[in-house]
From Swiss-Prot:
Its EC number is 2.6.1.-. PROSITE patterns: AA_TRANSFER_CLASS_1 (PS00105). Belongs to the class-I pyridoxal-phosphate-dependent aminotransferase family. GO terms for molecular function: pyridoxal phosphate binding; transaminase activity. The lineage of its organism: Bacteria, Bacillati, Actinomycetota, Actinomycetes, Mycobacteriales. The keyword Transferase applies. This is Probable aminotransferase Rv1178. It comes from Mycobacterium tuberculosis (strain ATCC 25618 / H37Rv).
Amino acid sequence: MEPLHPDQRRFLRRAGIAGRCGQGWHDRERPASGQGSGAAERGRLSRLGAAPARGGVSASLPVFPWDTLADAKALAGAHPDGIVDLSVGTPVDPVAPLIQEALAAASAAPGYPATAGTARLRESVVAALARRYGITRLTEAAVLPVIGTKELIAWLPTLLGLGGADLVVVPELAYPTYDVGARLAGTRVLRADALTQLGPQSPALLYLNSPSNPTGRVLGVDHLRKVVEWARGRGVLVVSDECYLGLGWDAEPVSVLHPSVCDGDHTGLLAVHSLSKSSSLAGYRAGFVVGDLEIVAELLAVRKHAGMMVPAPVQAAMVAALDDDAHERQQRERYAQRRAALLPALGSAGFAVDYSDAGLYLWATRGEPCRDSAAWLAQRGILVAPGDFYGPGGAQHVRVALTATDERVAAAVGRLTC
């Protein structure tokens, strides 16, 4: 293993974080098109009794995007055959019986669970990642269960001690919680997909997301290797959100921890995984982070103090889900069939679908403002997510989820093709 860059551990030393990024960086976040300014929207919602009347932490955050869909949801809900909700990527299929049984069997546990997770859970994570995704050289100490991956992403910059002197880089089109987590920690945020956009500066943390939410874009091995090499040369922590890794359709996603990317060296790398999509466990809040041993140990040390523990019955359910590949394959096939139905139906309605090579979404456009497309679909009883939820680059796209029942997907197809 090559010697570490002198700054490789800077993000672990709270006192050493201040001043680590150069001056002149500016947060490129802007209120998304169609959502209005955060202050104005919060004021409107306050008058409706739907938001805090006073400032505070929430005043530093953008409007919760789903709150802006109320009108479109009401319009879609008025359809005589009912709404087809393709907006939120929430599972609708039954949890596999073996997982339910594992949860129930562990439900008599009265004590506090271990923040680090049971040894059995950590063993299952290591084995499943090797078996399913070819991730090798992980040890149990490199695994940390989390209370759903959204929780981890929202608090990761804070848990790492980042602050106002630090820069967090997120994809130009991105899961909104990357930005929210940076704001909660008080860091600066830059949207960038290319390393050349960063110039000579060294951010504290750089997010990757492949397959992407919302676009379904898959980053290839060469791209990932380039990012890892660049980050290691500057002491930058790379966090790869891999919640959709097992859902490749037209491309085969690869983990940042795969030997072809990192040569088996997990230094400076974290991979975030969820069982919400692959095992329909969104309601269980079951996820985990794996990678760099020292960083995982630091996260564990802080999370112990904060009581960030995955309940023991959920840990038992996670073991059952990770040890069984059959239910995961069955769920993948369900999504594949829904994708095969929706993809041509969107085309017949005048939408072009960009990327969408993997994951749970179709990234669709008719070359018009995304809110207009969302309204057109809502008139037909179909609710989707406007692309501006995910950044300015999504202003002419909508995100169409595959997470509806077969019956509701068939209804959407009928409305799009009539």
